[in-house]
């Protein structure tokens, strides 16, 4: 992938554009927090050719939600589980809505 290809992907929510340091700064948290939520398998950062963690905007949104819960006093493991369940619920609701749209002849 060339530099121009990478630049064109910056609008892609799944493109791992952010280093760990930049991601931590954007979230107002520490690199240790990002490592912890990675160890809890909330997010799995991609790795650069040099082995450094890289994060996407989608992953940063997930991490921000976990940080919000931790800031409210929720243990990190529980916060990660809550975020996973919220994400699963949102996906199930989206699929359900699509199913209802397809099965409703009035739509």
Language-model regions: role of each:
Residues 2-19, 25, 35, 39-40, ...:
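Arg/Lys-rich, alpha-helical DNA-contact motif
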Residues 30-33:
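Short coil turns linking two alpha-helices in DNA-binding domains
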């Amino acid at each position: 992938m060339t530099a121009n290809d990478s630049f064109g992907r910056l609008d892609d929510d799944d493109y791992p554009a952010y280093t760990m340091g930049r991601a931590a700064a954007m979230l107002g948290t520490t690199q240790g927090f990002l490592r912890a939520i990675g160890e809890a398998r909330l997010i799995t950062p991609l790795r650069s050719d040099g082995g450094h963690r890289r994060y996407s905007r989608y992953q940063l949104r997930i991490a921000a939600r976990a940080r919000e819960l931790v800031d409210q006093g929720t243990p990190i493991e529980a916060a990660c589980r809550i975020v996973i369940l919220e994400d699963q619920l949102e996906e199930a609701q989206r699929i359900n809505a699509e199913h209802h749209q397809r099965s409703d002849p009035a739509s």
